Amino acid sequence: PTTLVSRSIKQLLQFRDEQGGEVIVKPLDGAGGDGVFHVTKGDRNARAILETGTAHGTRLLMAQQYVPEVRDGDKRILLIGGEPKGALLRIPAEHETRANLHVGGRAALAELTAREREICARLGPVLREKGILLAGIDVLGDYLTEINITSPTGFREIEQLGGGALERDLLDVVEASGS
């Protein structure tokens, strides 16, 4: 989705207005949905959320166009050695914007769409070139919303839902890389 990374509250509010009055904001170094907010034009807390998220203009914050398909869930796709090996559909709880499982989202095994395969095919070589053997990417509708290399969760859920144990794939890639 259309994205802005800024520490300027004025820029972030202007970006929100340009995106139809609603955006998702999140810290660049966050994990598990911490610090993720749906900020709307009529929200009386919008400025306070942005002040907190930017530490009063000293820390970068990412703002993304709000994608309504989030209500249907986003996909966490695990790429091992640059190849997609498993995918989860993460569906947010009824009164929640975040689909993260530990905040009440629920998981289901998912197949990749043609667009998701295209995203993986374009991203895989870049990850391999940079020596990134494991990444979790989040896809919402047709949009890549996140590339997570610090906490790419989903292994346990994929296995519990019958999608196989991906740990062996990861170990094979690590051994083959000589890392």
List the model feature ranges, each with a label.
Residues F15, G33, D72, T145, ...:
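Active-site-proximal flexible loops/turns
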